[in-house]
Amino acid sequence: MVRDYNAALRFVNDYFTMDFRKFINQYFREERRAQIDQNITPAKYNKLFGELSNRQCEIIDDKESKYIVVAAGPGSGKTRVLVHKLASLLLLEDVKHEQLLMLTFSRAAATEFKKRLIDLVGNAAHYVDIKTFHSYSFDLVGKQGSLDEAKDVVRLAAEMIENGEVEASKIAKSVLVIDEAQDMGEDDFRLVQALMRQNEEMRVIAVGDDDQNIYGFRGSNSKYMQSLVEQDGAKLYEMTDNYRSAKAIVDCANRYVQRIPGRLKHTSIQSATGKDGKVMTLKSLLDAEIKVEGSTAILTRTNEETMQVAYELEQRGLHATVAQSMGGFRFGNLAEVRYFLKQLGGKDDVTITKEKWNEAKQRTFETYASSTCLNIMQHFISDFEITHQSYYRSDLREYIFESKIEDFIAADERSVFVSTIHKAKGREFDNVYLMSAIPDGRSVDDMRSYYVGLTRAKRNLYLVTNPQTECSSVSLPLNMKDVWLDFFRGIKEHVLHLRSGDNLQYKDGYLMNEQDINVAALSASGKDKLKAWTDKGYEVVSVRVSYTLAWKPQDSNIEYAVCLANLHLAKQEKTSE
């Protein structure tokens, strides 16, 4: 470009005197002009947009629409689009991090978005607010919540904004991003509307799949996502290329989803994998030869079915990873979590030093080395470390409060992942066995739940049409209602010596450790649950600790330790007289 001395002088003079756009047009070719306009290096630009589809790029390039609503089909890259849109807002549109807010419905989703954004834009991601509706609402209300308060905190936050009771700087936003928009309920949408009224120029980007709205039982309704589409200045995008599932699986899901009424999407999902795949029907799981080739999942409707399947797999010599129910307790009540917090000490300290953190982590891993919950603790601590530059106690408390055990249970190719359909939402597997009869159409929630199950599969889908086949053995998980809680008041030390996965013995309604000391007793509910099986000819053949927990009675300030367990039962053969 600069071939001689005079040209160099002219270039410098024009740089300082000429209109910037005219200067760029005169001295740079079209491709280079586009790169200069990007305000980032070509390598960074390629990382952001190089592997995105045309539709995904179209959504990210949309800088004009005040309301962007994306109806994203399964496997269409919803998470990728949202993360790259966040990166684009920060790097290409110069949206300041304090002006950007992303709301999700789970701590696991918030963590995943934060991790991916860190990978894309580096440390700048730490300053972006990616929060659940509940945690953001607690921030506005001005206190950390309890379980009871969490039920109404979103409504309360919306009311406070409407009444002008929230400091303006806390709610001054130029962009609001909503994940899983189909899951919004009345209070959630009221909060969104309050923010929209407070920030008249605020852009809203909402992504979701109305076909996967499976939380109607708690008030979610995709009509609120539809309401955003009807706003002036709204643009609806459909993402219908499925990069997850093979053609046979997508075709099967498409035929089924047509039965669901009131759908937002008008375009059928298309497989973009280039693979045929396979869909097969099985009468019973007992008929299946389950091979762990790639990631494999067995999805059920209930937690009880999950435990029965897991035990059946163990009897076949297959390892099962179970997304088990929390059984009526909070993640923060786990003995492993309580031990870690105790090792951190200094409850009044605002921050936790890295040295203290690492010491507490090491002691916890050593003390609970034999616990089957060790992997859960490792994932929990690792995720917090990745998403937090500094360790603030308030952040840790919030993180624990919003977390669930299943958030930290990872599927791998060495075991079969066993879960309810609800807990498998957002996951994907090479092979899926769907343990559910096809819904009869009377419940739209059931129909959508079945659709979620269908669309978890990547290569092979097995539809088990008669999942209620009687098994020779079953697993009976005990929850907080199934154990006699007052029994634990005098045996705290014995319970704290237990580890998840330890073997126990069952005798006359009591669970005993290796020293024949009673460490748990069944409640009336637990005895009734067990009797329902023993009346069918089943007997308890083994017992394994599932969790040890902290429990505080309503009439006491003292915490006690509770043991929950899985009872394994086998059908006894009738002897001929």
Pin down the residues of each PLM region.
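P-loop NTPase Walker
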Residues: 1-145
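Structural recognition of the conserved hydrophobic beta-strand(s) that form the central parallel beta-sheet
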Residues: 102, 130, 203-209, 462-463
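Core RecA-like ATPase module of SF1/SF2 helicases and allied nucleic-acid translocases
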Residues: 107, 247-250, 299-449, 454-462, ...
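Charge-dense polyanion-binding interfaces
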Residues: 155-163, 320-356, 536-574
